[in-house]
């Protein structure tokens, strides 16, 4: 078994290791370090304005001339329903008051934001783009392919993987249920729930059904996870939580400490924080929101309704009222540079393969 795969060839990287596009937690330093170490660094641009994204890309290009990716959230067709928003605002009012937070103004601008981001990655010559929450329109895919930009889809089921391949993605992330942060799902099960299929189950089933390369994600923290994924047929891995505690991560010390102190049983998948299912460390905010007796507003509305509250809690060092996205392998986190992390992953993988 070799670490040279179709993924390394398509992305023009040394190692089949992708740093997940963790919106809100990536920095140009993290992305550049991963790319310079031989992996594929990713700008988590899901929440960025076009101005902010341009700044990030421009600075990143000063730090590396190696391939990197930009991760974008595919906009949804969810509607703004005033009654839902009013009810949620009433529920959040006492908690906002406790943190001295004003009621936010909701901006339904994600479609324009996505369009601007696509135009920008083309203009700036970004080597690769990964997508979360769905598949972009065919015109967008064709426009990116004309510029030879590599496209990375996200799937939480075989059905979603097939859809990604049919749409023209160059490779697909098999996001297992162990993964931290938002579920990349864009389909629902018969019970109208997001698919929650473990990485070990998802990867080989996906590999058997599609021809484009599969990249395993979810709970992968070290060389053991890389080798195991490749044995299952994956041609690379995407790691998120492992990079959250790295020196270059944009995660706060509060956040890093919470992950370091948590156990594999401490995370839950919930939609109460942003309106989309996401895996994070269970805390008081989630407990309180679970008492809400109405339907949670959809993403991006719920995300905007709770955003300022979560930010202020984090600023005040209160881990109980912010989001703490994390995968199910927190006992395996390490505190080191992203470069050292990649070196360790590769070294351990090679040792295992050479036994």
Swiss-Prot record:
Picking any one GO biological process from the record gives:
response to toxic substance
Per UniProt, the keywords (alphabetical) are: Detoxification, Flavoprotein, FMN, Monooxygenase, Nucleotide-binding, Oxidoreductase
Q: Which Pfam families match?
A: NMO
Give the enzyme's EC designation. Answer: 1.13.12.-
Q: Which InterPro entries match?
A: Aldolase_TIM, NMO
Check the record and name the CDD domains matching this protein.
Answer: NPD_like (cd04730)
Note describing how the cofactor binds: Binds 1 FMN per subunit.
Q: Which Gene3D superfamilies match?
A: Aldolase class I
Citing just one GO molecular function, the answer is: nitronate monooxygenase activity
Catalysed reaction equations from the record: 3 propionate 3-nitronate + 3 O2 + H2O = 3 3-oxopropanoate + 2 nitrate + nitrite + H2O2 + 3 H(+)
- What is this protein's function per UniProt? Nitronate monooxygenase that uses molecular oxygen to catalyze the oxidative denitrification of alkyl nitronates. Acts on propionate 3-nitronate (P3N), the presumed physiological substrate. Probably functions in the detoxification of P3N, a metabolic poison produced by plants and fungi as a defense mechanism.
Q: What is this protein called?
A: Probable nitronate monooxygenase
User: Organism source for this protein?
Assistant: Staphylococcus saprophyticus subsp. saprophyticus (strain ATCC 15305 / DSM 20229 / NCIMB 8711 / NCTC 7292 / S-41)
What lineage does the source organism belong to?
Bacteria, Bacillati, Bacillota, Bacilli, Bacillales
């Amino acid at each position: 078994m070799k670490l040279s795969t179709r993924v390394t060839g398509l992305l023009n990287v040394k190692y089949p290791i992708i740093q997940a596009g963790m919106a809100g937690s990536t920095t140009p330093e993290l992305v550049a370090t991963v790319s310079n170490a031989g992996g594929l660094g990713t700008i988590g641009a899901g929440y960025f304005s076009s101005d902010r994204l341009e700044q990030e890309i421009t600075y990143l290009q000063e730090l590396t001339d190696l391939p990197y990716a930009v991760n974008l959230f595919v906009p949804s067709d969810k509607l703004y329903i005033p009654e839902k928003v009013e009810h949620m605002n009433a529920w959040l009012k006492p908690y906002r008051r406790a943190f001295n937070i004003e009621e936010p103004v909701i901006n339904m601008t994600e479609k324009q934001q996505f369009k601007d981001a696509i135009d920008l990655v083309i203009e700036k010559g970004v080597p690769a783009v990964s997508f979360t929450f769905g598949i972009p329109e065919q015109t967008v895919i064709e426009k990116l392919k004309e510029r030879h930009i590599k496209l990375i889809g996200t799937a939480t089921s075989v059905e979603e993987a097939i859809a990604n391949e049919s749409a023209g993605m160059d490779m697909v992330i098999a996001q297992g249920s162990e993964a931290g942060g938002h579920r990349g799902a864009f389909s629902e099960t018969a019970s109208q729930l997001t698919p929650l299929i473990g990485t070990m189950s998802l990867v080989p089933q996906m590999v058997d059904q599609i021809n484009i390369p599969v990249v395993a994600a979810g709970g992968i923290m070290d060389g053991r996870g890389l080798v195991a994924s490749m044995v299952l047929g994956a041609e690379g891995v995407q790691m998120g939580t492992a990079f959250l505690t790295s020196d270059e991560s944009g995660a706060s010390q509060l956040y890093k400490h919470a992950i370091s102190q948590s156990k594999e049983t401490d995370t839950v998948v919930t939609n109460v924080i942003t309106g989309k299912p996401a895996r994070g460390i269970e805390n008081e905010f989630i407990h309180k929101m679970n008492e809400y007796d109405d339907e949670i507003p959809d993403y991006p509305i719920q995300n905007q309704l709770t955003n300022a509250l979560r930010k202020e809690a984090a600023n005040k060092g209160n881990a109980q009222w912010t989001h703490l996205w994390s995968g199910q392998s927190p006992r395996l986190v390490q505190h080191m540079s992203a470069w050292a992390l990649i070196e360790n992953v590769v070294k351990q993988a090679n040792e295992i393969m050479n036994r």
